[in-house]
Amino acid sequence: MDISRPRGTRDFLFAEMRNRKEVEGVLRRTFETYGYHEIKTPIFEELKLFTVKSGEEVVNQIYHFTDKGGRELALRPELTAPVARLYMNEMQKKPKPIKMYYFGSCFRYERPQAGRFRQFWQFGCELIGGRSPLAEAEVISLASESLHELGLDGFEVHIGHLGILRGILGREEIPSELQDRIMGVIDKGDVEELEALLGEVEVSGESRELLMKLIGTQGGPEVLDDVEEYLGGYSESLEALEEFRELVETLHYFGVDDYHVNLGIARGLDYYTGIVFEIYVPELGAQKQICGGGTYNLVETFGGERVESTGFAFGFDRLMNALGMDEENMRMVDVFVIPIQDSTVPEAIRITQELRAAGVSADLEVSGRKLRKALSHADNLGARFAVLTGEREIQDGKVTVKDMERNSQETLPRDEMVDKIKGRC
């Protein structure tokens, strides 16, 4: 029988899991310093949760099924909608803003390729009830600081505002559903398809030219002066531009000054309403985007109160690629304990348990191998020390400790052994 891993999924072995847990730990600590607390949602939800405002491309990629009770369910393709559902079910009466973060796997039926998988992980946060330039700036600051804490260099923060683009479409009286479709094409970056769609929905020549000019606008905060000149009498877009200026000013107080204004960011999810941002690592090429987020109002879309929120998520797998952490030379255990004779197994067990109780990673030779093979196994594990328990040493109240890195050994008093090893690990 040929049993293999499903296409588009991965197995993670010891070294890679160690690295992923290390990065996860840094992100958890950083998010918690900003006052966020962790939540968990189910891996599957009702299908309709994702078909209302997730965007055409995401909807087409959903893994969905009908359960034995006739319910239409789906494996989650992203985590913002489940968080909004959790808020509606459990937290509407709690004081706001509410800060929560999450880490979990998502599923999309995508064509597997470099950097894209059908099961992938997101690490993100949501600030529920927090739409303001101050809230948005703090969220962007958290994303940037998290990457600095991980020691990642060369990343770029790109910030846009959907209100500027939607203000133009609103003046053209384009329905929101068609606006969502246009935003999806802008997000794909397909200029020819965008021009064709704008012509199809009869956007005026003036607005069409303005949209094309805006989505190509990138640079420092100074380009917002040019944008103001472009917008002229588009009042809703000018209001959004003023919000953008307030965000720029507030980011400075958070120490976030290195970013790009990029009005071509539209995001692939239809629920974003205001500020949007993405973080790129250019050296990753086509898969350079490692983070995306912005301001949205999903709760009202789902039938709840109007509560604007801001959040983002790291594509955890791409983040790991960007960090390029070494997977070799992993130490699987600090100490490997080897009983020399069968009669010394009880003492070897006691030593192993004492080391573990002291917080030292310890493993025990349980296969009955000869000393030479047991030491070879300790070396393969990357053990720092091997502890040898022989009958004579036990009678004398001592143990032999072999330094695997220096290829030397010494005899230590039994009652001092744990403290001395702990001090060297």
UniProtKB/Swiss-Prot annotation:
Keyword Protease: no
Pfam families xrefs: HGTP_anticodon (PF03129), tRNA-synt_His (PF13393)
GO CC field: cytoplasm
Keyword Aminoacyl-tRNA synthetase: yes
GO terms for MF: ATP binding; histidine-tRNA ligase activity
Biological processes annotated in GO: histidyl-tRNA aminoacylation; L-histidine biosynthetic process
UniProt-annotated location(s): Cytoplasm
Catalytic activity: tRNA(His) + L-histidine + ATP = L-histidyl-tRNA(His) + AMP + diphosphate + H(+)
Family: Belongs to the class-II aminoacyl-tRNA synthetase family.
Protein name as annotated: Histidine--tRNA ligase
Organism whose genome encodes this protein: Methanothermobacter thermautotrophicus (strain ATCC 29096 / DSM 1053 / JCM 10044 / NBRC 100330 / Delta H)
Gene that this polypeptide is encoded by: hisS
